[in-house]
Structure formats: C-alpha cells, structure tokens
Amino acid sequence: MPLGYAIPVPLFHYGAFQPLWQQPGLIQAGPAMGTPPNVEALVAALQQRGFDRRAVLLHYIDPFMLRSAPLRGLRQWHGPRLLACGDLHHGNSPIETLAAYLEAEPHDAVLLTFNPALVVEVRKRLRVPVRSLPPTFFRYPSAVPVERPLLQLLHVGSLGPHHPRRRELVAGLQTRGRLPFRHVSTSSPEEAAALYAQHALVLNVPLNHDLNHRFFEVMAAGVPQVVFGDPGLVGEHRALAERPDVFWASSLEELEELVLGLFAEPDWLRAISVPPPPYWELKDLLKAAFAP
C-alpha cells in the first residue's frame, strides 16, 4: 500500500464531471484545466483546496488522448502515480503508445480498465505492475426491471465507421429476421439503463479485446445479457464469465439458437438473478493496484 493512500485521491480525467464516479476519498480533476494539461497546473489547483501532492494520483487516460493531449510533468507529483488506461483497442499500436508515454512520464503502476485479456501482453512491455481490476473506479446507473419485460433482444450502441463488426452483426440479425430484435442508439448511460430495464435480454458486442462499459451497465440495470465474443475477454476474472446472467455466443447462428432457447422459457429467463457489478471501494482498489 503506497504512503498517502488515505489522503483524498485526485482522479485526473478529460471528460465532464461524473456524479456516478464519486465516492468517499475521491475528487475529480482535469475537465476545466485547459490544454495542454500539466501536473504543475494540477498541483496548483489542488493546493488551493488544501490537497497534498503526496496523495495518490489516479490518472485516467486512453491511447487517443495519449497521442493528442497527454498529461505532462508527472515527475512533479510527489506521491504514488497510478495510470488507469482504457480503450486499448483504439488506434494504431496502442500498447506501444502506452509504453512510450510511460517512458517519458513515469507512473508506479498501471490498471487496464477494460482489457483484462491484454494484461499478459502489456506486462511484457512495461516495467511497472500491470493489472486489470474491472470495473475499477467506475459506477453505473441502476434500474429496476419491469415486471413483464419485452421478449426482444436489445442492442444499444454505435454502428459507425469504427464499429464494422457490430454493424455486420446487427445487419445480419435484421436481414435474417429469426429473432425479435431491436437496435437503438442512446445519448447517456441513464437512457440506456431505462431501455435495458424494459427488455428481457441485452446483446453486448465488445470491440476487439475490450470488455467494455456495457458489460457492467447491463448488470447495474438488473438484466441478463448475451456477449458476442469469447469468454477469454475477462482474462483471469473467470467469475465474470460464469455469472448466471451472462451468456456467450461466437457466431450469428449460435447467437440465434441461444436466444431462441432463452425466449422459449420466458419465466425462467425473467427469474435469473442479476447481481450488481463487482464495484471496488477506493482503498481496496489502490491496495490491489499497487501490490508488488
């Protein structure tokens, strides 16, 4: 456990303030700091609020931001530095991008937020402890499933140019017409949670080796899901793949047969227990991340 872990922990990220991420001991920093982001400005802003730079810095980033607007000056942070990296399926050579950044801006440990399947590969490239402890510091909107959910397979997500696999699968389901199927796009996790709660089953199509937010969003909404992919996406977290509310399919035909079988027993499907996501308390997350 690093010195200073009990001091309130700044979470540096690039997005808007996220109320769901808040928990005791965490303060969000970064969205209003301007560009380019640097630790000197971060320290100055935090010291105005009485924070100590010996605290743990939780730095959330992805390969796109590492290339376009990386946080600089990490050596000026006097406490432990934990980098939480998401979206390691984005861009060209994302692992090399991460390794090059860490050579220039050292951190004491790395968390892969949604890429447990890539832990072994990333460890080979980095000199610091690397783990994946999903869903890290994230939290998701909860929902109460309706009493009589729609017997439709719901897919929520983008089908844009960066998502050809999803687009192909959705088009295949729509063209074949064997399943009652609905595809929608949403503008917020809260909107998605409300939709999940109205349906008996959700289709989750991860990208490459990314477990994705949707895996946990659906759990938080209390609805079973079918993941189109390999259970190896969970890495060493086998319990996630073996949950009673998570089903797996690796082909369009297998998906259709699985869903038709589940919809043939609607009472059994509705009775499936859906435990909440395995959320981490902040102190426990830091302890696990910094373990030798």
Per-region residue spans from a language model:
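Nucleotide-sugar donor-binding catalytic core of glycosyltransferases
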Residues: M1-D52, L58-E242
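C-terminal helix of von Willebrand factor
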Residues: E121-R123, E257-L262
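Residues in well-ordered alpha-helical elements
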Residues: F216, L252-E253, K283
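Conserved acidic donor-binding segment of nucleotide-sugar-dependent glycosyltransferases
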Residues: D245-E253, G261-F263
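A charged, aromatic-enriched C-terminal amphipathic alpha-helix characteristic of glycosyltransferases
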Residues: E256, F263-P292
